[in-house]
Amino acid sequence: MATGQIFSKTTQALFYNYKQLPIQRMLDFDFLCGRETPSVAGIINPGSDGFQKLFFGQEEIAIPVHPTIEAACNAHPTADVFINFASFRSAAASSMSALKQPTLRVVAIIAEGVPESDAKQLISYARANNKVIIGPATVGGVQAGAFKIGDTAGTIDNIIQCKLYRPGSVGFVSKSGGMSNELYNTIARVTDGIYEGIAIGGDVFPGSTLSDHILRFNNIPQVKMMVVLGELGGSDEYSLVEALKQGKVQKPVVAWVSGTCARLFKSEGAKSGGELESAQSKNQALRDAGAVVPTSFEALESVIKETFEKLVEEGNIPPVPEVTPPLIPEDLNTAIKSGKVRAPTHIISTISDDRGEEPCYAGVPMSTIIERGYGVGDVISLLWFKRSLPRYCTQFIEICVMLCADHGPCVSGAHNSIVTARAGKDLVSSLVSGLLTIGPRFGGAIDDAARYFKDAYDRGLTPYEFVEGMKKKGIRVPGIGHRIKSRDNRDKRVQLLQKYAHAHFPSVKYMEYAVQVETYTLSKANNLVMNVDGAIGSLFLDLLSGSGMFSKQEIDEIIEIGYLNGLFVLARSIGLIGHTFDQKRLKQPLYRHPWEDVLYTK
């Protein structure tokens, strides 16, 4: 491995398995360091493509999303770092795929628990092809002022405190990702800061070793000293001992192998397998090889400070110019939660709330709806009228839904849905095709019937005055008239609704007025009977006014908005869906209207 610097201020990465927070932290670090281009060139999310919106400073940017590693590499040939956030189950396969890409030279594997056999194969391939693996089980790495991997170094506040926004003179490598944050802070306090920091990961077989990175740091002119933090267990530290003994490292190395707190990290590499793998043996071996090893972890900070100050006195470390990092704009959601800003909302909702443990309809929890045995009518009363209506009202709503659910295949709505379904269209297209026929001539006259009946009754018009007045205006009376029903063949649905209302409603004044209008219109023509639109419209007026739960203004608003037509739309959707399923189940062919049923004329 050896060689030298693996990251720079122009390094770009491909990020595998989209994770919003680590990517945003990388972009925030970029902005903090004054990078001109984002360090994340593309995202790989298997099976997906498109873009993900993230922030680069104050500017919102769109980062391309690719379905495969190959597609991402082809689209971003200058991106040479692969950051793998796959789970341990798929980390090995995706990492091997990345290693085989000619444009990628560094692969960081974040997942813990990668099988040892898979790790060995990855390491073997990487070494044979001059690639660098960081991990598995790593938090990543950082080159101060240039590039960082994922969640390395934590929050922006911690990065600023550790002065990672500009390069220092110390190369740092550790097994533990958790302890690396602590050491970044320590090093920033007593030196001019980190130049590069790497956490190799705590698994038994790391993709790159402590000595790999120390030898690499030794070749980087800007790195003047190195700090190593090892753990008991394994033999990785002994390769560093050999490198020191052989004189391969010419720069000061401060080292400590942690033994007392390794159990807290529970990493695979921290399992001691004998005396040679103990922290005491490793520390002594490093000390004997020429590393500066403190007597305890608590003394590590002072030893780092002494080593750095000695280099400064010898003139080996020029002063690092301090820079003031730019302020990272705070996310709106974070600022709102902290009470720092207020922002207007874009949608107002008063009928439901899904922010708690369970959705609430008009303030009624879902569990209450189920426990109390509420029906569809009760749910409609909550979501449409924002109140719990009496049972006779909600039962009337349910009756309307049942009676209007379907009226055979010959009416315009069902016909359209059938034709659309037979054309091979999907359920939603077939449903909408039928719904779009609902209007003044088919099912959409309920609101108008209620509107005109209410106006006439409230103004005290006689049926004669009402009907003749509508005639003079050239307006047909909504809710009156039927294509197949007549005086002698009444609509059974109308009769059922009227029967229910007589038995349960406290008042049926609007329905009685509509019946009087029907009596007058029947004197003109045998088919001018009350239809289901007229029955529902007049009876809904009686429901709204008789329940005592609505003001006159609310009733007028309900009719004006179109609530009552909504009832027909809801009900008839059941039948239209049924006709669609029926045609598909019967595997009916494309419909073509027969010639003999068309009058061809000039």
Predicted regions span which residues?
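Catalytic-core regions of core metabolic enzymes
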Residues: 1-334
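Non-transmembrane, aqueous-exposed alpha-helical and coiled segments at domain scale
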Residues: 326-602
